[in-house]
Each structure stands twice: as structure tokens, then as C-alpha cells.
Amino acid sequence: FPCQNLILFQPNLPYRKERLFMDRKVRVIQFGTGKMAVYTMRYVLEKGGEVVGAIDVNPNVIGKDIGTIMGKTEMGVKVTALENAEETIRTLKPDIAIVTTMSLLNDVKDALMLCAKLGVNAITTCEEAFFPWNSNPQVTKEIDDLAKQTGCTITGSGYQDIYWGQLITSIAGSTQKITKIKGSSSYNVEDYGIALAKAHGSGLTLDEFDKQVASVDRISDEERQKIIESGKYLPSYMWNVNGWLCSKLGLTVKSQTQKTIPTTYKEDIYSSTLGTTVKAGDATGMSAVVTTETEEGITIES
């Protein structure tokens, strides 16, 4: 995405197709103008789309031109304050919204619900939104129901879509028998936005990490399920990926657990993303392992 020729197949009608946006560029509005937005807005422009607006909560960027934010010449599109988001969307009438703000569904709910309310297709880099049904089903259903009412699509995507998802299912599809799927992935939280860094516990002392991040894993399956149903569960990224893999492969989840371990560094290290120095021995991030057992006898560990 975005595409200049969108093929729309209408259900319950004789087969026909309509080409939209033949004579104009796809109109995109950007939610959040941080590190990830610099890339997503550039990608939109490179693929022939048009960024018609941008929305942010940070007073330091409100009123700035998006060209300046991207390190380009000014483009005549200024960042709008979040409180004016609905008015901005109604005025600009975008085809697509890109939401690159936070990592948890509860934190992007308002933006996604607004898009659903106004019938604007939205895609988000929120990691939980990749497959939120197994971590926050209540909010997921709220967004899903509203999007269906207004006829738009709300979806989560990103790195995991290809490398933790489609790539694995493609390989699995060529395999005669599977007993276990095991994988690992590493990345530098400094290369991403502050939402990802905070979700990984970066900058916390080990005691803070234990209380705020790791403690959620030291509970029974029944306790975890209650927290999930309450909408307060804090999933690691692989929690949602494992759920996605099971759904895609037609596997029935019997149990799923996660364990998070802080990573540290022997010296003080400055983080431009956090805007502070992480002390030696404090958490620079985390290692998360999610293990899923299925009724079909296949284990997924990632």
C-alpha cells in the first residue's frame, strides 16, 4: 500500500470490478509523526500516494510541515493537534489512515475507532494489532464491529507480517509433517520509536522491569485469561504472532505462556529514542519467549 488502482470486488452481486482512484492519487492521513512515520510517509510518496494530513499529540511538532519532519523541503501540509482529528479527517476525506503511534491496542483504540466511525481504511504498526484476538478480544470486537458497520478495513501490519508470519506459513505449507516450529528474532530497539522501547522495558531498573513487565507472566492460565478478558493484558509481540500462526495454520491452541527476561549492558549507554542515558545494569530491552501448545500436537516456540 498505497495503490493507485484499487480493485473492489462487491459481494452478493454479479461479478464485476470497479477501479477506484484512476484519475487521482490515494489520499493518506498520518497518525503520529515520530520515527516510524518518517518512513511510512516517505513510502507513500515513493509509491505515488499523497499525504494530505498528519495528526500528533506532541506540541513540539504540531504546526510543523511534514516535509521538514521527513527531512525534505516543505510540502504545505502541517501537523494537526489530536483534539482536532475528527474535524481534520472529515475535511480532508482521506482514503487511508496510517497509525504509527503506540504498540498496544488500548493505546491506538481511539484512533482506530475514529477511522472506523468515519469509514476510513486504516493500517497500523501497533504490534498487538497484528492479531489482537488472543490478547484483547473485547476491544478488537468493538473496532471490528464498527468497521463492518461503516464498510472499512482496520488492520495491523509490519515486520512480523512477512518474517514472523507469511514466511513461516509458506515453509510450513511445503512440509509433510510438523511437530515443532521454533524461531528467534533480534532487533535494536534504538532503531524504532519510543512506544516500542517502552514496551520492551528499556530504561527500567531490574526491579521496575520485574514489577512492570515480567510479573505478568508469573500467573496461572486462568488468571491470565481473566486479565485478557478485562483488556489489561500486556502481550509480548510474539504472543500475537503465535496466535496468528495458529489461526493461519488451522491449529487449536491448548495453552500459551510467555516469559520475558531483561537484557542489560555493562556500561552506561545513551538512548536517543528515550532521550536519556540507560545506566549500566538497567534494562536495555528484553528477550521474550512465547510457547504455544496445540491440540494437534504441534508446538510453536518463538
Q: Locations of the language-model features?
A:
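N-terminal glycine-/serine-/threonine-rich beta1-alpha1-beta2 phosphate-ribose binding loop
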Residues: 8, 12-16, 22-117, 250
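Active-site-lining helix/loop region of Rossmann-like oxidoreductase modules
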Residues: 27, 31-35, 173-302
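Short, ordered loop/turn segments at secondary-structure junctions
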Residues: 57, 102, 127-130, 159-160, ...
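Short, hinge-like loop/turn segments at secondary-structure boundaries
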Residues: 69-73, 141-143, 172-174, 199-201
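A short hydrophobic/small-residue beta-strand
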Residues: 121-123
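Rossmann-fold NAD(P)-binding glycine/threonine-rich loop
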Residues: 127-151
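Short alpha-helices
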Residues: 148-177
